[in-house]
Curated annotation (Swiss-Prot):
One of the record's GO cellular component terms: cytosol
Subcellular location: Cytoplasm
Protein family: Belongs to the diaminopimelate epimerase family.
Principal location listed in the UniProt entry: cytoplasm
Quaternary structure and interacting proteins, as annotated: Homodimer.
Protein's UniProt name: Diaminopimelate epimerase
Annotated function: Catalyzes the stereoinversion of LL-2,6-diaminopimelate (L,L-DAP) to meso-diaminopimelate (meso-DAP), a precursor of L-lysine and an essential component of the bacterial peptidoglycan.
The gene coding this protein: dapF
Residues annotated for substrate binding in this entry: N14, N73, G83, N84, N170, N206, E224, R225, G234, T235
Catalytic activity line of the entry: (2S,6S)-2,6-diaminopimelate = meso-2,6-diaminopimelate
Single GO molecular function: diaminopimelate epimerase activity
Short name of one Pfam family: DAP_epimerase
Length: 329
């Protein structure tokens, strides 16, 4: 029998159980055990309400970063990156080490994280780097007959919609649409197909439909690989922001407001001397509750769960966002 302590967290209501492997003495768990635990704990029918995945936090394998994040989705699959999750891990580690900025190791990169000015309502807000950014088909991987897909119609996917694809480093397929397309079932049909056996995206892909709201604001809805529709996907919001800036020739460094079903974030971008692009995702890092479970014979049983008062603060932002989005329909 093992007792596992957790913090229930969310970024833009993309919710997770954050599990510190060192404090729980589970650093020797196999990937299979981490996956099985995630499947059990993240079940939406569980007494704790489930989650989109588990954020496993442990020591970095490199010198410099204050910790490492590993993301396991609710179906047991591994996510190479999660922007919403990284914000909450950034807060957890920065508070643990009494810092305001640092570096955190992820599966594909070591990324800058820091505490940021609140988006409002005294919501804890953090800024995290999203990189590397790649457009080459092999980085997704993608097989649609082009080496780089940018604002192009792919008849095999849809006769009218123009798509762009980018990895950040997880793969994203993005199209800008109007409200009528958002209200249709096009996204669900396409995303479900591309995340089952198909010749175009053999490893699956996150599929985002984006609506322009103004010159400095967009709405993003994402079907996440391994999860399905979620309130928000941090890397998707970052990737969609970059594509919008490229399509409209926007200044990369200018903040873009990104609205989603889970709230609002801001995204900026920059290009270094070598021409490499990186993104900065700024949004909430909400701690919903702290608790513990018993894990025995592949069964997860709730032991304790104590709520914080932070969700009330975030709901004030959500209310504001919903009222704003009604005016854009």
């Amino acid at each position: 029998m093992e007792t596992i302590h957790f913090t229930k967290v969310h970024g833009s209501q993309n919710d997770f159980f954050l599990v510190d492997e060192e404090e729980n003495h589970i650093t020797e768990w196999s990937d299979e055990k981490r996956a099985n635990f995630a499947i059990k704990l993240c079940d939406r029918k569980h007494s704790l309400g489930g989650a989109d995945g588990i954020l496993y936090v442990t020591k970095s394998s490199e010198v410099g970063p204050i910790g490492q994040m590993r993301v396991v989705n609710s179906d047991g699959s591994i996510a190479s990156m999660c922007g919403n999750g990284l914000r909450t891990v950034a807060r957890y580690l920065l508070e643990k080490h009494a810092l305001t900025d640092a570096k955190v190791e992820t599966m594909k990169a070591i990324l800058d994280v820091k505490k940021a000015t609140s988006l409002g309502f005294d919501i804890p807000t953090y800024q995290v780097e999203i990189s590397p950014v790649k457009f080459a088909a092999e980085t997704l991987p993608m097989h649609v007959g082009v080496e780089k897909l940018f604002n192009q119609v792919i008849p095999e996917l849809d006769a009218e919609l123009a798509f762009s694809a980018v990895s950040v480093p997880n793969p994203h397929l993005i199209t800008f649409v109007d409200q009528a397309v958002l209200d249709s079932n096009k996204q669900e049909k396409l995303a479900s197909y591309l995340n089952s056996e198909n010749p175009y995206f053999p490893d699956g892909v996150n599929v985002s439909f984006v609506k322009r709201l103004s010159d400095d604001a967009i709405y993003v809805r994402t079907f996440e690989r391994g999860v399905g529709f979620t309130n928000a996907c941090g890397t998707a919001m970052s990737a969609c922001s970059l594509i919008k800036k490229m399509l409209d020739n926007d200044i990369l460094e200018t903040p873009l407001n990104v609205y989603n079903d889970g709230g609002r974030v801001q995204v900026t971008a920059k290009k270094d001397a070598a021409g490499e692009i990186s993104l900065q995702l700024i949004g909430n890092a909400t701690f919903v509750s702290k608790g513990s479970v018993r894990y025995e014979n592949d069964v997860v049983t709730e032991l304790t769960n104590e709520a914080t008062d932070e969700q009330g603060q975030y709901q004030a932002l959500v209310k504001e966002v919903k009222e704003f989005l009604k005016t854009t329909e």
